[in-house]
Structure formats: C-alpha cells, structure tokens
C-alpha cells in the first residue's frame, strides 16, 4: 500500500497524460470500481473547451483513492497510459525541488511506467514523468520522491548505471535559474575559442600558428566538408582561460586575407539559442517601449488612400515618423499605421481623426496594440458575453437560425404560435455565427451550420419576414401581426424589445455587401459629397440626436437610437423592405450612420445598394427553384 495517503486527507487524485477525447463519464467508469467518487473534473481551455490533458478525481475515502493509485496507475484509456498521482494543492511542494531528481540519457523504450518501476525501490514516488514530444521520448525525465532521503538514495545507487544498455545520469533537479547561473559561471572560465569567417584556404597548421602565440593549445581544428574543403570556421582549445581570453581580445574583428574574422567563446547550440532568444526579446521590448503611445492604428480606409495621402491627413497633428497603408496584391487592405514622434501628438490625432470622414468613409483611429494585447482583450470580451448568456434562463432559439457554436449547450422551449422569438441581448452574437450576405449576395441556408439537424415541420415564413443569420447586429424592428397573414409589414419596435435585441458588446462592424457596394468608386459621375457636421439629427416626431448623445448612451442603446431614426426614413422609400434594409444598414459603423442621417443623398444611395443586393438574392433563389423543379429535385 502507498504510505503517503494520510498526508492527503482530501483523497484527490491528479490524472495526467489523458487523450483529448477522454470525458468525465469515461473517467467515472474507470475509477468507480475503486470506491465512491464525489466529483470528477477534466480541465479544459476556457475558450475552446478542449481538454488540457489532465483531470482531478475526488474520492469519498482516502483509502479508495490510494487503491486507485496503486492499481490503476499507467492503465490505458483510449490508447494512452494515464499517469496518476496525489493532487498537490500547495504549489510550494511542487516548486521547491525537495525530493525531485533529474534523469537523462534514457533509452527511447523507457516510458513512465518503466521509470516508475525502476525508481520505486528507493521510496514513495509522488510524481514520475518521461518528457516526450510527437516523436516519442526525448531521453530525459523526472522522479519526485516524497522525501529528500529517498531522492539521495536513488542518486547514489542509480547515477552511472546501465538502463537498457545505456549509461544514465541521475542528479538533483535544478531550476532554470540555477542552470543559467552555472552556465554563466562556466562561461567566465572558458578555454575553448570559436573562430569563423577566415576563408577556404585555412588548415589546422595555419590556424595553430596564428593562435599559438597566445599560449599552449590542447587542440586545433578547422571544420571541413566531405571533400576536405574548409567550411570557414574552426576551434582552438587552450590550456588556460587567460590565454583563451587574450586570444579573443586581440584577434576578434581583425582582418585576415581581406576578411574580418570573428573570435569568441565557443558555445553549445542550446547556449547560442538561449542568447539569441534573449537578445531578440530585448530588441522586441525596446521596440515596444519606443513606440508605446505614439503608434496609431487606422482602419476603414478608402481604397484610394495610399501612404502619401495617409501622411497628409495626419500631418497637421505633429511630426510623423512613418505612415503605412497595408497592401496585398497591390490593393489596399483597408487599414494602416501612423507613427508620431510624441505621445501628445498621437493622442491629439486620435481625438481629432477618429470618426472623421476621409474620402467616402469614416476612419477608426486608436492606439496600436500588440497581438497579445488584442487577444487578451477579445478573450475578456468573449468571457463576459458567455457569462451573461449563461445567466439568462430558458432562452428561445429561432428554428431558422444556425446552431450555436460547438460545445455550447442551450435549451430550447416551444414558441407560442404567431409569436416572434425573443433573444436575450448577449445571445444575439452567439446565435448568429455566419455572415448575413456573401460577396455575391447569397443567403446561407439556415441549417448549414447544424449537422444532422431535423428541419421544423412548421410552414416556412415568406422571404420578406425571414432574416438570414448575422454575426453582429440584430434586426431592430419587431414583426407586426396584421389581418392578412400572407403579408407582413415592418413597424417601429417597442423600446423594451429594441433594447433586448441589441448586443451587449459592440464588436468590429462587419460590412456584408459586395465590393462595389462597400467601397464606391471615385471615378463615378457624382463626386463624393462631404456634408458639413450638423449640431443634431432631426427626425420628425423624435428628439434630436447628436454625436455626444450617442456617445454617452450605453452600447446596447446606441443601435436602438439609430434604428428608430433610420426606420421611418427607409419606410418612406421602401415600405415592404424597411425592416430588412434597416437591419442591414445597422451593421455599418455608428459614425457613418450618423452621416447618412444628416445626408439624405448618402442614405438613399446606401438604401438603393441594399435593395439591389436583396433583389439579386431573390432572383438567384427563384432561378435555383426553377432548376430544381426542372430536374425533379424537391425544394425545402
């Protein structure tokens, strides 16, 4: 029996090296014969929900946990032997290094179980692991004993012994800080010198003559290829460190046969890689510090804006050190960077230029962020959204919406007949993972993201009331029921429903139109119209809307305020399509929507483009139905 059980009264086991597909149910089936289990948890990534390869099994009784550890360690689950040990809740026990030994030069055939069986004779083992990669064992491992005395006995007996005909090294585990300190101490007392860039005509004798004046050398070697030709580098090993140091000081950087040679301390590959990594990280940190607060990210650029135009637009705010529009295949990617000489200039540029219309589009300007910072910010947003989704009881899923992302369960309840589905605010983005319109204006099938889904038996609504899935912005109008059920019109939504249909977190706007719709060409007959900023947007029957009012409103109300002012204007142009068009236009950035409210011509242009997209889609759907009817393929 394992004598360490009394030290762990919580009876919690760590189970590692798990196959990614192992679930709590599989572990319960495996461990329940050992005794009653309180809980099992497979640890997973917070975002992807993929298994991290380890789990915790909590038994009711320590004796049951001890029995599982003794009888099930290294058992195979889904083709992989699992590694079981007592759960160490105190991190200081794991990180102190007491009782931990390091073994290297292991044969490839030695696995965790073989290492455990070999070293268990010296004392109770808390943890045992052979380090592996995708190709198998890397030839070294670790054994953590319960006591330091057991570790010392293992080192004394096993160091230098043969395991599977290979002489192994067994020693005390040393932290990276300790190893780096030892390497630094050895580096100061080096005797081996590395020389490179001396050409192809150098041989051992000439190299010895060149460096022999600094002191007696133990060995001199010029590295050659298979034909005996010099590779341009070699080594000289001196007897004393002082001689080696003198050779480096006097010969490094000198010219030899018209070439400047390099002379320095010979390093192992690992040392060189570590030093290069350290230098790279230092350069990266210096660059980040240098550009902190002065580098701006500019997006939503018009296709006609190049580096010079970008520099010209931002030059009034200070000295620009660089301005770059990112390109791909000779075409603008729609974003770029502007770097100023001081943080004050950059801050002023953000204040003045963010939201300003340049050419035909409003700019988004903000301080540039590193990839790690952006990912952390997006992860935080995602976790907040997920937390709010899970807090909403009994959400209702529209049967014509795509399925939620994989790994996310959401209960559905039946809807009352002729009632519109209710979407909690933060669920909208979760329920609509696919884009509303493709580049050709095609609507995705509502079941394309739901493998093996059963189509509902209810009659399919008319196209005028169906909404393809959207990943960002919900429809802002509620369905009005009228006497004629074959025709439904869109009307202004109630304030409560509007607030519920607005996402809690505003993400990057997604433009869902074709390229010609999104980026109007400059060579059209009409010149781009620049409308003077008005103090407020007036819509009959509603209070004036200003940019400051919109900015001060919570994110979940901003789209509602814009939608309530856009809908009556669009309804006057296209009464039957007002709801659809409003929902499409609300995916545009708020600053551009304000501009459209101020400029009737701009609004009409965008509405006409949206109508063209809808008509193209309807024509394509009608043609597809005709083809299916001709070929006898049933339509759904």
Swiss-Prot record:
All copies of domain PABC, residue ranges: 542-619
PTM-bearing positions, type Dimethylated arginine: 493
Asymmetric dimethylarginine: residues bearing it: 493
UniProt modified residues of type Omega-N-methylated arginine: 455, 460
Entry-annotated residues carrying Phosphothreonine: 319
Pfam families: MLLE, RRM_1
Name by which UniProt lists this protein: Polyadenylate-binding protein 1
Organism: Homo sapiens
Upper taxonomic lineage: Eukaryota, Metazoa, Chordata, Craniata, Vertebrata
């Amino acid at each position: 029996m394992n004598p360490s059980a009394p030290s762990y009264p919580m009876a919690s086991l760590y189970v590692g090296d798990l196959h990614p597909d192992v679930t709590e149910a599989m572990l319960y089936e495996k461990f329940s014969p050992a005794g009653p289990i309180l809980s099992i948890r497979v640890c997973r990534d917070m975002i992807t929900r993929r298994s991290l390869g380890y789990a915790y099994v909590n038994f009711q009784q320590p004796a049951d946990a001890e029995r599982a550890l003794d009888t099930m360690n290294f058992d195979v689950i889904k083709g992989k032997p699992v590694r079981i040990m007592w759960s160490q809740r105190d991190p200081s026990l794991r990180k102190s290094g007491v009782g931990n030994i390091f073994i290297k030069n292991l044969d490839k055939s030695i696995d965790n179980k073989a290492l455990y069986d070999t070293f268990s004779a010296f004392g109770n083992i808390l943890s045992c692991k052979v380090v592996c990669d995708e190709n198998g064992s890397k030839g070294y491992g670790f054994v953590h004993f319960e006591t330091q005395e057991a570790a010392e006995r293992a080192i004394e007996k096993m160091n230098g012994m043969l395991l599977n005909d290979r002489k192994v090294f067994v020693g005390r585990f040393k932290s990276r800080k300790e190893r780096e300190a030892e390497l630094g101490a050895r580096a100061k007392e080096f005797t081996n010198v590395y020389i490179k860039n001396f050409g192809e005509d150098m041989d051992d004798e000439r190299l010895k003559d060149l460096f022999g004046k600094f002191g007696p050398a133990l060995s001199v070697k010029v590295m050659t290829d298979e034909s005996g030709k010099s590779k341009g580098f070699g080594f000289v090993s001196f007897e004393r460190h002082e001689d080696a140091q003198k050779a480096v000081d006097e010969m490094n950087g000198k010219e030899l046969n018209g070439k400047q040679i390099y002379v320095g301390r010979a390093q192992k590959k690992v040392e060189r890689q570590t030093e290069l990594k350290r230098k790279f990280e230092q350069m990266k940190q210096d660059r980040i510090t240098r550009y902190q607060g002065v580098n701006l990210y500019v997006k939503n650029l018009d296709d006609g804006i190049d580096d010079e135009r970008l520099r010209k637009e931002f030059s009034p705010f200070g000295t620009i050190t660089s301005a770059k529009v990112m390109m791909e295949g000779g075409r603008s990617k729609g974003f770029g960077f502007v770097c100023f000489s001081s943080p004050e200039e950059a801050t002023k540029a953000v204040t003045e230029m963010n939201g300003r219309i340049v050419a035909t589009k409003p700019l988004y300007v903000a301080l540039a962020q590193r990839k790690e910072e952006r990912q952390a910010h997006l992860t935080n947003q995602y976790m907040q959204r997920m937390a709010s989704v899970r807090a909403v009881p009994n959400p209702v899923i529209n049967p014509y919406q795509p399925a939620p992302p994989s790994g996310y369960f959401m209960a559905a309840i039946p809807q009352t007949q002729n009632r519109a589905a209710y979407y909690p605010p933060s669920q909208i983005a979760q329920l609509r993972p696919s884009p509303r319109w493709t580049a050709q204006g095609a609507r995705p099938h509502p079941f394309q993201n739901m493998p093996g889904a059963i189509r509902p038996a209810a009659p399919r609504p008319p196209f005028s009331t169906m909404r393809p899935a959207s990943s960002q912005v919900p429809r802002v109008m509620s369905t009005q029921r009228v006497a004629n059920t074959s025709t439904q019109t869109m009307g202004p939504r109630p304030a409560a429903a509007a607030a519920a249909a607005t996402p809690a977190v505003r993400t990057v706007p997604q433009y869902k139109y074709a390229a010609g719709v999104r980026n109007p060409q400059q060579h059209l007959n009409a010149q781009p119209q620049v409308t003077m900023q008005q103090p407020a947007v007036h819509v009959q029957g509603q209070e004036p809307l200003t940019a400051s009012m919109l900015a001060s409103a919570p994110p979940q109300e901003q789209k509602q305020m814009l939608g309530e002012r856009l809908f009556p204007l669009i309804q006057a142009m296209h009464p039957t399509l007002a709801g659809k068009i409003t929902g499409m236009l609300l995916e545009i950035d708020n600053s551009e929507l304000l501009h459209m409210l101020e400029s009737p011509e701009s609004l009409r242009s965008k509405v006409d483009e949206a109508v063209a997209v809808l008509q193209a889609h309807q024509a394509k759907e009608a043609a597809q139905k005709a083809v299916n009817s001709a070929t006898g393929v049933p339509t759904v």
